[in-house]
């Protein structure tokens, strides 16, 4: 078996820390979090984005939500129901189901060895592309920097174009 045995996990320490956390902050934990998420968490995410990705964002620009389906619904509301959305093909088809459940037009963009084919975005009149360039599912492709610049070039040609980057596991990326 590849699994680490439970004998190595410090259950006693873990249980003690959980008890301390719950008893020290009972009152605070019972309050509903603010819309958009707990400020301390959004501040930590903003620091992480700056330190590890070079992105300068304020905590007010970060929204914490209860799962991807909910958050993609918010994105659709913000970007517009009139936009034509697209996802990678092959790709994570649950994303297409989410877009379809919000009654937006969603298409598929074929991939080659470097990721999505940028020319198809133009051909299909796509407004919003949903990609996972750091580790594409299910192919595992890491989009090279040249293709990323092509994608940015596509987006810059019209103010109605957007890129949704699903960076679900970029911390595990070793190349690209």
Language model regions located:
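Walker B catalytic acidic pair
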Residues: 166-167
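N-terminal basic, amphipathic alpha-helical segments
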Residues: 1-19
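Conserved core of the PLP fold type I
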Residues: 18-21, 25-160, 170-174
């Amino acid at each position: 078996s590849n699994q680490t045995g439970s004998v190595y996990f410090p259950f006693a320490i873990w249980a003690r820390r959980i008890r301390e956390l719950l008893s020290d902050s009972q009152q605070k934990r019972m309050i509903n979090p603010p819309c958009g998420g707990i400020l301390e968490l959004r501040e930590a995410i903003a620091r992480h984005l700056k330190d590890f990705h070079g992105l300068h964002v304020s905590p007010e620009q970060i929204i914490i939500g209860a799962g991807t389906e909910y958050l993609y619904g918010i994105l659709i509301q913000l970007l517009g129901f009139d936009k034509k959305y697209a996802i990678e093909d092959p790709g994570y088809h649950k994303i297409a189901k989410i877009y379809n459940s919000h009654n937006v037009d969603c298409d598929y963009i074929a991939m080659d060895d470097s990721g999505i084919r940028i020319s198809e975005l133009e051909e299909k009149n796509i407004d919003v592309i949903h990609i996972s360039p750091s580790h594409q599912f299910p192919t595992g492709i890491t989009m090279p920097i040249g293709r990323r610049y092509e994608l940015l070039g596509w987006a810059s040609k019209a103010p109605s174009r957007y890129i949704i980057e699903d960076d679900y596991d970029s911390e595990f990326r070793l190349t690209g």
